[in-house]
Every structure is written in structure tokens, then in C-alpha cells.
Amino acid sequence: MSWPQVQPEVNIGVVGHVDHGKTTLVQAITGVWTSKHSEELKRGMTIKLGYAEASIGVCPNCNKPEAYVTEYSCNQCGSDEKPQFLRKVSFIDAPGHEILMATMLSGAALMDGALLVVAANEPFPQPQTREHFVALGIVNIKNLIIVQNKVDVVSKEEALKQYKQIKEFLKGTWAEDAPIIPVSALHKINIDALIEGIQKYIPTPQRDLSKDPIMLVIRSFDVNKPGTPYNELKGGVIGGSIIQGKLEIGDEIKILPGLRHEKPGGKVEYEPLYTTITSIRFSDLEVKEAKPGGLVALGTELDPSYVKADSLVGSVVVKSSNKNVSVLWNLKIENYQLLERVVGAKELVKVENIKKGEVLMLTLGSATTLGVAKNIKNDELEVELKRPLVVWDKDLRVVISRQVSGRWRLVGWGIIKI
């Protein structure tokens, strides 16, 4: 016997400043080291979005929080009675380095809740702690847990002093009541209390499976090894998260904006890609249908050359019959709001007004594109995009970043008008 093989039902982001122990924390909970990319292993930092899953269970014989486990046995009491399965969750490990803010923002679009990891042995808040916190608020994350990591390398007094600083920082913000849970990810101390916190504070959202399915793409790849005979080639794979509705094997889908074509005279157009879903998997689990929660890999009939090296990242997948999705080269943003200060730099710089002709970076869902500010009046902003954005609903929030001292910095957000 073991726990049921099911897809994850909730996505939990793991965010915070570089080197504060995000990837180590994910490993402590799931047993998976999410940095797999060769460059990541060499540089010791997360570059792409990492991913891992964990099943959560509770031992009927132990007291809480020790009763919470992520394995099909309890090391605490050694009882023959197996822990009861509660749910499967997935973790999206976002990069903490300042140059990778766009990657963090594209991951935030998939999150149902988040763990903000703070190192107890560094001054609080660090620049990306602050920037990630603001970003989570902008993309409307409601469920947050602050994880005070590395408490094993500071005294009790230092840990308590920082706890008070965190409380002070949260006061008056969207996350004023967020719980703060101290852990040592390296020594796996208090991980059971964190799992209890995840169960209590990051519930699985209510999902409406009758809605038109929408999937945000964060990966795409060719699974064929070099030299595979032509008649054995497998179609391209797209990976991402379904944010509403459900997809099934055999569904005909379209991928937007699609393939880029350069026309004579330098004009660029995008053509939607149409294909059929041939397989669906979550990590090692093959399923017939996929719902929101977890990162799903869709096998398709696409030519593998279309998906190579994450070329479809930022795309949106819908059913081929869906006519309610717009692909926009010109974005009208209303009720846009700028932060008072640029939060991700060491010094807090005042945010200047957006100027006509300024190049901005916009993030919507898992897509990031550059654009030029054209018309600005009151709280409305029009931006001409270098690559079109796919708008799948009304009142979507777009995140606005601009170059500050050679780095893209989060400066505001607005609502897309369609």
C-alpha cells in the first residue's frame, strides 16, 4: 500500500533573497533538489523556475505538529498504523537574484500561495526580500507564510529580534497577519511545523472546472535524443500550469501567440499553433486529464523544432475553439499605479513618472515582453509591444518594470483594458 497517485492540487511559490535557503528548504520538505540546470549547479543559484512535489499526510498516533509527514511512514512513533493522506502540493522555487526578477514574476502567476524565505543571519529586509514581497502583493497572492530560515546559526535573542523586525515590516501591509515559522532547512528542524502551517494557511482554492481551460507555459522542450529515427520521433512537449478549467488527452488546442514570422520589410507577425494533446504527465504520473495545480507536461503532435530550448515560454494554451482570447500588440493599461520607491535596489530610489518613449518591461502571466510607452494620460497608459501579449480575461493585472541603474526593477502595475 502507499498513498494515492494523484496530481498536485495547489501551487506554492518559494521566494526571497538569493542564498537565503529556498532550494534547501524545498529539498527538506520534498527530498528534491530543484537546481538541475548545469549553470545553476556551477553557480550555486537558481536561474530557471525549480519545481518539486510532496504528498502531505498526518500520523493518527502523534501530536501535532510532529504528526505531519511527507512520507508514507512516521519516523516519530514508529507505529504500524500508516499516516493518513491529506493532499499533494507542488513547490515552485523562484530565483532570488536581482537580475532574474522577470523569472520570479512569471512564476508568481502560477502560485496559489507562497513561502517567503528569510535568512535569520542577515539584516532584514534584504532588497529582493522586499521586492518579492511587493510582487506577491501585486499579483494578488493572499496566502503567505514567512519562513525564518537558518535559525541554527544565530542565538535565540537574534532570532527573536529579527522576528520583531519582520512583524514591524508586515504591519499595515496586505500580509499583516502572515504567520512566521522559524526553521533550519539544512538540519530539517521544525519542517513538521511548516507543513502544519502550509495545511492551515495555504488552502486549496475552489476550482471551477467548467470554465474554458487556460494554461500558462513556463517550459517547452524536445524529448527526442539526437539521431532518433524519423518514424520514432515524439512531438514537442509544453510544460506549465493550468489556471482554470481542465484539459484531456485528445483535446485540440491552440498555442498563442504562436510562431514568429518575419515578413518582407521587417514586419513581424505571430501565427497560432494548433495541435492535439497526446499525453499528460505530472512528474512521473501519467494521467488522462489535468486540472489546476502542479506543473503539467503536455505531449503534443507539434514538430519538435517548434518547442526547442523553451522557445514557447510565455505562451498561453487554450482549446482550439476558444475565440475569447486576444493577442495584443498594443496594450492599454488603466488605473496604473506606481510604487513610491524602487524596492529591489540597495538604496530606495523614488519612482519617477513614466515618460513617453520610455522602454518598459511588462509581465502578464508567464509572459514577459518589452514595450514603448506611447500615450500617457492621468491613470491610463498605452504601450506598443515588441512581442504581443495574450490576454485571456478581463481585468487582468500587468506588472510594470523599468531599467534602474542597468537592472530591471519592479515599479508598478495596472489593469489591462480590452
Swiss-Prot record:
Cofactor: Mg(2+)
Gene Ontology cellular component terms for the protein in this record: cytosol
Family: Belongs to the TRAFAC class translation factor GTPase superfamily. Classic translation factor GTPase family. EIF2G subfamily.
Gene it is expressed from: eif2g
Pfam families reported in the protein's UniProt record: eIF2_C (PF09173), GTP_EFTU (PF00009)
Cited HAMAP family: eIF_2_gamma
Organism: Sulfurisphaera tokodaii (strain DSM 16993 / JCM 10545 / NBRC 100140 / 7)
tr-type G domain mapped to chain residues: 7-206
Catalytic activity line of the entry: GTP + H2O = GDP + phosphate + H(+)
InterPro entries named in the record: eIF2G, eIF2g_C, eIF2g_dom_2, eIF2g_GTP-bd, P-loop_NTPase, Small_GTP-bd, T_Tr_GTP-bd_dom, TIF2_gsu
GO molecular function, one term: metal ion binding
Protein purpose: eIF-2 functions in the early steps of protein synthesis by forming a ternary complex with GTP and initiator tRNA.
KW Transcription (keyword) present: no
Record GO biological process: formation of translation preinitiation complex
Residues that bind Zn(2+): C59, C62, C74, C77
Binding of GTP, residues: D19, H20, G21, K22, T23, T24, N149, K150, V151, D152, S184, A185, L186
NCBIfam families in alphabetical order: eif2g_arch (TIGR03680), PRK04000.1 (NF003077), small_GTP (TIGR00231)
Protein's name in the database: Translation initiation factor 2 subunit gamma
Bridged cysteine pairs (disulfide): none
Region (G5), start-end ranges: 184-186
Ranges that cross the membrane: none
Region (G2), start-end ranges: 44-48
Residues the record lists as binding Mg(2+) 2: D19, G44
Keyword GTP-binding: yes
Lineage: Archaea, Thermoproteota, Thermoprotei, Sulfolobales, Sulfolobaceae
UniProt-listed Enzyme Commission number(s): 3.6.5.3
